[in-house]
Amino acid sequence: MSDDERDDWPVQDIVYTSIVGVVMLAAVLEWFLWIAAFLYCLWKVFVKAEHWTIRVLSVVVALLFTALRSIFLPIMVVTLPLPAAVVEVWPPGMVEVLQWFGFWCFAGLLTVPWLFCIYQLVTNQLGRTKRIKQVLDEVSAPKVVIVMPCYKEEPDILVKAVDSVVDCDYPPSCIHVFLSFDGDQEDELYLRTIESLGISLTLESYPKSIDVTYKEARITVSRFPHGGKRHCQKATFELIDKVYRHYLQRNDNLFILFIDSDCILDRHCLQNFVYDMELSPGNRRDMLAMTGVITSTTRKHSLITILQDMEYVHGQLFERTVESGCGSVTCLPGALTMLRFSAFRRMAKYYFADKAEQCDDLFDFAKCHLGEDRWLTHLFMIGAKKRYQIQMCTSAFCKTEAAQTTKSLIKQRRRWFLGFITNEACMLTDWRLWKRYPVLIFVRFMQNTIRTTALLFFIMVLAIITTSKKVDQLPVGFIAVSLGLNWLLMIYFGAKLKRFKVWLYPVMFVVNPFFNWFYMVYGIFTAGQRTWGGPRADAAEASSGATAQEAIEQAEKAGDDLNIVPEMFVRAAAARRRSLNKGNQGGGLGRKTSVVRPPDKIDGRFTARNQLHGGFFTHGDESLDSIAAGGSGEASEPGTRWAPDPRESFDSTLYSQTYGNYGVPPRRLESIMDDEDRKKFELAQQSQSYTILRPARIV
């Protein structure tokens, strides 16, 4: 054979190389952008650091991250099924060493989390089945308050969400729903909702907060001045703190569940949450926070909704379960999170601080607003005194609607990506987390080093399709570990949950890398354009007359939540405080700007109460006299000063001082009715009770 003939490539190699070359360029771009974006975030953390340990960890993490990513690049090149004319150029010894190192690194990074997941699934029950076998009544069941903020929701969807809560297999007298409207207008949504709850529409006006009994459960319907979801939750918390002030003096079995207004709870969701947090055999009653399993639902099936469904199941039941086994989940989503109320109230003033007004730049905005769930979980992880107090409940389920269009999905994933990468940089540079959750943070760091390698599997599939390579010429071990282990889990999840479409996981394994590639590239380029090119001329700005939240809502309404000027948030907030003569309390935290990590003062603060001999529950640093006296920071009349409270630093006193009196007790519905309406309401309540099947609750 002549040299010219040896140099000729087979047709299938030419076709394969022309196709795979494009994919490889995309993979290289993804590899470069991920390392550039992560190093940029570490640099921002270094610049903003409040403590020398942050700077040291920023440098160490950046060096290790760059070194590992640089090693993985040649590993990926020599592992790819390239044509023989290319492969013969690589030195055989180098190829063997790199492939050996790469296989065992990837195998370890994929197998160890898989084993953590298996351990959690063996030791915790998975599925929508009830776990409490004794009879639950209003004495044995802990009280659960459900906070459901609502803003421009469809009335039917909102009522359906409320029904899913009160229809849970849980004593109705132990359920208290706080349905809070973000806006104090008596609009169509408000009126249609209260009508569905049995409230007459014949009244001329309604109190800001009304108590009503619906299907034997207590529902408090409130209207608060518009200020965003977090503001609405904060006002609701103040109301709960006032309503349950005396109850908390002698009880520590009150739990607060945050859900979205479009979430549908599974029938056994509440009792399974409570089982893990309070009622399981041998429970030490020190579980502080839990999230459940959020699955997607859709009105119309399509490729993107099916992919989202598989992503939700895999992300919830694998990734969060692994984190839970390593010591703590790193994201408590606002759509489904339960917390022990007595512990949460010690963190409330930090949790509800107006983080948007503390943003100095887009990095802060992405960290504290786009990724607020992760930032707040970081807060709780520092507040907890030990591991395994912030966990995943694999038997508490709820459904939420998936993104229906490609446009909405891209915007959602851009938010998630920017929130993830900024908070990940902050977590990896917090020495307190390395000390308290070493396994978790190490696993998170190593998983970040192998991100953006999923396109390589598509290249292997392409090699077989084009007959450029045979199966025995491919890295079968790598494929078996990366795809096989995950597919086995998805088959188990699908059978256990009867969601058989998740068995299509190999389709997601091949297709999803392209979606993830686009999400990341789009997110980085649009954020980079905003960071280095500056905002557009029509960007929303905060000012002395417009809050940061109003600027954010203006940008979201215009269709681009990054078209803002966060650099103006701090100055605008300071200008408003000066104009209102309210000082510069910085959202209640005594600082003017955002920080890289939660303050040291919250370290170990997120704890449950202990019971004293007198029957009172207290934290070690609280005054028993103040608890016995019932002091809890009641709202004073407008224009009066608050009396000093020995527990002021722990309770919600700060809110009413700073944000006004939201703690006005709700009025019972009967108190605002005339005699005729009251009789009609009582008849409706009786009829409602008869329509509900009330057998003995063996749960």
UniProtKB/Swiss-Prot annotation:
Subcellular location: Cell membrane
Phenotype seen when the gene is deleted: Leads to a winkled surface morphology. Impairs penetration in host plants and exhibits a significant reduced pathogenicity in Arabidopsis and cotton plants.
Key words, A-Z: Cell membrane, Glycosyltransferase, Membrane, Transferase, Transmembrane, Transmembrane helix, Virulence
InterPro entries hit by this protein: Chitin_synth, Nucleotide-diphossugar_trans
GO cellular component: cell septum; plasma membrane
Residue ranges, annotated region (Disordered): 628-648
EC main group: transferase
Enzyme Commission code(s) on record: 2.4.1.16
Catalytic activity: [(1->4)-N-acetyl-beta-D-glucosaminyl](n) + UDP-N-acetyl-alpha-D-glucosamine = [(1->4)-N-acetyl-beta-D-glucosaminyl](n+1) + UDP + H(+)
Stretches of the chain forming a coiled coil according to its record: none
Any one Pfam family match given in the protein's UniProt record, by short name: Chitin_synth_2
Membrane-spanning intervals of the chain: 19-39, 58-80, 98-118, 445-465, 474-494, 507-527
Xref: SUPFAM superfamilies: Nucleotide-diphospho-sugar transferases
Domain of life, per lineage: Eukaryota
Record's bilayer topology term: Multi-pass membrane protein
Nucleotide-binding recorded as keyword: no
Function: Polymerizes chitin, a structural polymer of the cell wall and septum, by transferring the sugar moiety of UDP-GlcNAc to the non-reducing end of the growing chitin polymer. Plays a role in cell wall integrity. Required to successfully penetrate the host plants and thus plays a key role in pathogenicity.
UniProt family annotation: Belongs to the chitin synthase family. Class VI subfamily.
Protein name, entry field: Chitin synthase 7
Lineage: Eukaryota, Fungi, Dikarya, Ascomycota, Pezizomycotina
This protein's encoding gene: CHS7
